[in-house]
């Protein structure tokens, strides 16, 4: 085991220059289009792109991602913003883009994806500092900046709330949807506290749901999402009160 680990460590060291050469922020650049008042990409489309980028060999998918990025720079959005609200989606893993599509068909665009397999914080650039190997940089990043809900100390909890608040501000979200997959206890605890913090202390409307791994109980979820979106619309009409 030690020999295998040492060989892998050597590979990381050897590939530092390769990492720097291939370093790319294409997914981040594509995702940033969602910050626009009338984005040229939907949350569902971005979810598909993000998922594909995680399961396809990079050397095969990068040319297509670069092509997509260039297309989005000249893509004309709908004449009028086609959604009734903008939301940040936070929580357990969501590897089914149909879940994002469900939210958007209810009337809310998912402008930021802060969940397991999402681009926040999964697509954050890992800085390789002077004198560090790629392996060291990855270890440092995950030990000091990991946003997983399994880290339960107060500093990490506050850090996660601050990051979601930052996303809501940057992407001009009207509200936040916290979801946890059934039996994911970490996000189950997180969403309860987050609902209180965001609703009562930060003044950001928050919806919390529990979901199965497979997209079931669609009618129930649709009812919850529609009611939440309606409450966001009412808040907009009342001037954010």
Locate predicted features.
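Extended, charge-rich low-complexity interaction segments
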Residues: 6-13, 140-160, 234-241
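Acidic beta-strand-to-loop metal/phosphate-binding motif
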Residues: 173-182
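A charged, amphipathic alpha-helical module
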Residues: 1-123, 153
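Peripheral docking tails and interdomain loops at the edges
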Residues: 187, 192-241
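Flexible internal linker/loop segments at domain or repeat junctions
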Residues: 112-158
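A short, acidic, amphipathic alpha-helical segment used as a generic capping/interface helix at domain edges
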Residues: 155-172, 190
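Flexible loop/turn segments at secondary-structure boundaries
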Residues: 94-98, 118-124, 161-162, 183-187, ...
């Amino acid at each position: 085991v030690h020999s295998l680990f040492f060989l892998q460590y050597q590979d990381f060291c050897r590939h530092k220059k390769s990492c720097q050469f291939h370093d790319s922020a294409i997914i981040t650049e594509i995702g940033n289009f969602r910050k626009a008042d009338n984005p040229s990409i939907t949350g569902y489309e971005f979810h598909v792109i993000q998922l594909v980028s995680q399961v396809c060999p990079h050397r095969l998918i990068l040319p297509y991602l670069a092509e997509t990025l260039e297309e989005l720079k000249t893509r004309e959005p709908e004449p009028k913003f086609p959604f009734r609200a903008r939301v940040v989606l936070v929580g357990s893993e969501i590897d089914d883009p149909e879940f994002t599509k469900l939210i958007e068909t209810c009337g809310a665009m998912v402008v930021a994806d802060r969940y397991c397999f999402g681009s926040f914080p999964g697509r954050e650039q890992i800085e390789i500092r002077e004198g560090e190997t790629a392996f060291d940089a990855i270890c440092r990043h995950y030990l000091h900046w990991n946003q997983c809900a399994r880290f339960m100390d107060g500093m990490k909890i506050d850090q996660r709330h601050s990051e979601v608040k930052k996303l809501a501000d940057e992407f001009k979200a009207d509200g936040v949807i916290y979801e946890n997959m059934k039996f994911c206890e970490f996000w189950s605890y997180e969403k309860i506290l987050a609902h209180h913090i965001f609703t009562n202390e930060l003044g950001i409307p928050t919806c919390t749901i529990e979901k199965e791994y497979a997209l079931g109980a669609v009618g129930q979820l649709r009812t919850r999402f529609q009611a939440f979106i309606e409450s966001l619309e009412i808040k907009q009409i009342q001037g954010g009160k």
